[in-house]
Amino acid sequence: LSKFKGPASKPTGITHFVYAGGLHLDRWKALKEIAEAIKETDGKGILDIFTSKDSIELYHSNFKMLPVAFHEAVPHEHINEVYQKADVLVHTEVQSEKMKGFFKYSISTKIPEYLATEKPILFYGPQDMKLFEYLLQNRVALMASAKEELQCCVNRLVSDEDFTEMCKNARCLAEKNHCASENQIKLYNAIETVLLNS
């Protein structure tokens, strides 16, 4: 996790919201709503989307006239370079009856990486997801499940509000729950306890 922690982005007057990932499973629709919310800030922000070349070709036309810049995805070993250019890291899920059972209890592999960067995180997705509950309870991200909440979050993120405490909470959570070596120790101890009590 230490490799994901880096210097804060230098203020440029424009807040860079960064999303790195696929646009399938209707995620592009949620990202479009985020871009529309950013547009309402009158030039104070831009959404940088890092995704596959095929996804760019397939979905870019849906983002016309919106403050969005598309970039080709980078290999995972270089993803930290993308994160460090961000002012805000974006994660989104969509309400889908078809995929509801899958997403309800899942946590994207990007979440621990986002938490470790100590940068503000914007989550936009359904409230009934365990991920929503997890991030909200630990006070590590700005959360929105509806357009009105989303606009409020975006407005706060492009303002001069200080999110230092939230970002430090995120880093602590990453180290507590998402460190591979620590989790290996916890698993070993759990197995040892079971064996001793059997």
Residue ranges and their predicted role:
Residues 1-14, 161:
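Acidic anion/phosphate-binding donor-loop and adjacent secondary structure
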Residues 10-28, 35-38, 167:
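Conserved donor-binding/catalytic core segment of Leloir-type glycosyltransferases
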Residues 14, 42, 46, 51-88, ...:
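Nucleotide-activated donor-binding/catalytic signature segment of Leloir-type glycosyltransferases, i.e.
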Residues 17, 30-34, 47, 150, ...:
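A structural motif in glycosyltransferase catalytic domains
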Residues 26-29, 77-81, 89-112, 121-133:
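Nucleotide-sugar-dependent
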Residues 108, 126, 137-148, 156-161:
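Conserved acidic donor-binding segment of nucleotide-sugar-dependent glycosyltransferases
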Residues 115:
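Short alpha-helix at the nucleotide-sugar/activated-sugar donor binding site of glycosyltransferases
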Residues 145-151, 161-191:
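A charged, aromatic-enriched C-terminal amphipathic alpha-helix characteristic of glycosyltransferases
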